[in-house]
Amino acid sequence: MFDSCRRDIHYLRLSVIDRCNLRCRYCMPDGAKILEHEEVLTHEEFLRLAALFAQCGIDTVRVTGGEPLVRKSVAQLVAGLKATPGIRHVSMTTNGTLLAQQLPALLDAGLDSVNISLDTLDPAVFRHITARDEFASVQAGLRAALESPLPVKLNCVPQVGVNEGELEAIAALARDNDLQVRFIEMMPIGYGAAMPCVSGPELRARFANRWPELHPVEGTTFGNGPAVYYTVPGWKGSIGFIAAVHGKFCASCNRVRLTSQGFLRPCLASETGCDLRALLRGGADDARLRTAIRETIWSKPREHHFEDRCMPATRSMYRIGG
C-alpha cells in the first residue's frame, strides 16, 4: 500500500526477539535491559499479524532481532511466514554465531536470503566490539552461508578508532566471494548516538583511491534496501554503502518495522506508531488490526532527521530491530 507521501510500502522488518548472545558496544552492551518473555509476541501472534500485513500489501519480510537465531524454533516461524499468502520473500539478518548449526533447518523452512553482521576480521577487535569470544563461530556461519544456495550479504558498521584500519580488507571479501559487503553508517540511536560516524561518501572516496576501477553496479539493487553498490572488474561480489545520515534516502523508503513487543514503527527515527500487541491481546478482530496497520503506514513521516543527532537516549537498535 501507499503512505501519504505516495511511497509504496511493501517491506516489513520483523524483530522476533530483543535478546542477543553478543554485547556490541553500539547496540546492546552489557547491562542492557531485556524484555520478559510474556512481553514478546508469540509465534502465533507474529503469524497472525504477518497475514494481515500481507493483506495490506506487504510482500517482503526480514526477520531480525536482537539475534533472531536465539529465539526458540525460529525456523518454524520462518516456515510460517513463507506459507503466508502474499509474502513472496523472507530473509534474515543475523550475527552469524548460531548460523552454521541452524542453516539446514532455515533452508528447509524456505529462507530466501541471509545478511550476516561482521565488523572486523580480527578476533581481538571482535571481542572488543562484542564482549564475547565468538569470532570463530561467525566465520563458520559465514562459510556455511557462502556454501549454501542462499544469496549472502555482509553488514559492517565502520567505527572510528576501532575497525577503521581493516575496512579495505573487509571490502575485499567481495573480490573472491559472491558476496555483497555493505558498509552501514553508525545510526545515531541509543548507544550509537554518542559514537562518531564514518560517512558513506568518505568511505567510498577512500575505496576509490584504493581501487581506481571501482564503479557503480548498474541494473540491480541486490534486494529491497537502500544500499548503493559498486564493484571492481574481476570481482565476484560487490561493495554497498548505506548512508542513512549522509545520504538520506527517505524519499524511496519502502519499509516499516514491527518490534518484538508488537509495536509498529513506520520509521526507524520516529516515536510514533501503533501498539498492535495491545490490540491483539485486547481481542481486536482482523478488520480492526488491518485498519490500525493501514493508518500507521499512511502516517509514515516524510523523512528522518538523523543529521541532527537528536534521537532519544532511551531508544536502542536491539529493541527496534537492527
Regions found by a protein language model. Name each.
Residues V16, L35, E67-R71, Q159-N163, ...:
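Short, small-residue-enriched loops and turns at beta-alpha junctions
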Residues M1-Y11, R175-D176, M186-G322:
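Auxiliary Fe-S-binding modules of radical SAM enzymes
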Residues V16, C20, C24, V63, ...:
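Conserved, mostly hydrophobic/aromatic
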Residues R23, C27, R71, A124, ...:
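Residues that scaffold the ATP/ADP-binding catalytic core of kinase and kinase-like folds
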Residues V40-V63, V70-I184:
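Radical SAM/AdoMet-radical enzyme domain recognition
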Residues L22, P123-A124, K248, C274:
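Glycine-centered loop/turn positions within well-structured domains
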Residues A32-E36, D122-I129, G190-A194, D275-R277:
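A short acidic, helix-capping loop that chelates divalent metal ions and anchors anionic groups
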Residues S4-E44:
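Canonical Radical SAM [4Fe-4S] cluster-binding loop centered on the CxxxCxxC motif
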